[in-house]
């Protein structure tokens, strides 16, 4: 009933399967073994749908149970020692603290690669938060049931009974929010590979094997030789601090050992729907973004830009170029800036055209940028950003060009390196494209205005191997227009579309 009421997520399904196995074991007078129950639940869930193994929620759920099982195994081995049992009986509160820390380490150890693979980051203080939040959840659940039963008689009395639970949950929320404001609250890992995950779990497996061999006797003798020191408060604090440091080292190891990011030159045309979003990692390691917004995707910054930046380990953006201030080019940027430090993304400089169209949208965005303490740079035709390895050159608008609207005043940028030659055109109209008088060959030209026929100039794209169109699937504007697609085909330019292909990536070998 609970599973049906909550939508029967895969994590809930796993819990129900394991609960059923527990009840069956009790009925037949058998002992319940958590790893066995976990294996049976996994078998039947995958039997129904093998693709479930790729679901992040399912992976996290099973790794959490694996961490608990590993903690149970460790505690059972320790409990066989007389000194440890004596410590448990004499100092139950201290024992619970040490036990909680131990389980926190095993949980983080098992879940860390999956968390990094799914979210491209590792929460540093998660283990410490669990020490505070998890023990109190017993009170929350018990209080919730009590309030539910009381509310059967009268709703008003039920609300009163639920007040302590509400206060606790509000306190947990406040604590989590304050934690997000601490320095180094997350380690952005970038996209990790299968072999890195294999190395992490292989290391855990080797550690367990090591502890089951002759070496474990020497290790245990060393540990239990100092068991008596637990009687003194000073030593309890010392062991507690050591356990916390081990937890923190696990997080650091997750970034240093398991996490590896490609540092090669790459250009990413993101699938932001009806909008533009381009990430560039230059040969010298600079992180550059051009635009970043959408009118078809809600919260484009949170759900598209931020994961993309984190997946590539881009926590610091050296330059964020804004071609013009239409919402489908700036909504994601504004969203990230308004979230502030919560995103863990630092933008050093935002670049506008010196001849950007002046309107209310520009004034609003400029105010947000200045409030975030970010430098604003105004770029003119011929201005260059880069070094010996790459250059980004402003081609448009010129000082003489008179734009009739903000699209025509879009910033046009030419990217040149030893590997790629690309042209980014914002939402330029046909007159602006013709004004640039493009003669150079490019590997790829991003078509202006999402493939609009009103921005297409015949003959321009014959200079490019690829024509990139960033647009939303089945958008209301009909982008890209048929005339544009036919023109590109006649010019021999290969068409790349984010609405059909998703994100398009150019990466040097």
Predicted regions located by residue number:
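Non-cytosolic membrane-interface motifs at loop->transmembrane helix junctions
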Residues: 123-134, 159, 188-190
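Hydrophobic alpha-helical transmembrane segments of integral membrane proteins
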Residues: 109-110, 131, 303
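Hydrophobic alpha-helical transmembrane segments in multi-pass membrane proteins
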Residues: 1-126, 192-260, 455-458, 464-466, ...
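Non-globular, low-confidence helical/coil segments that flank catalytic cores
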Residues: 82-94, 150-509
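Internal helical hairpin/lid segments
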Residues: 136-145
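Hydrophobic alpha-helical transmembrane segments in multi-pass integral membrane proteins
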Residues: 110-116, 145, 172-182
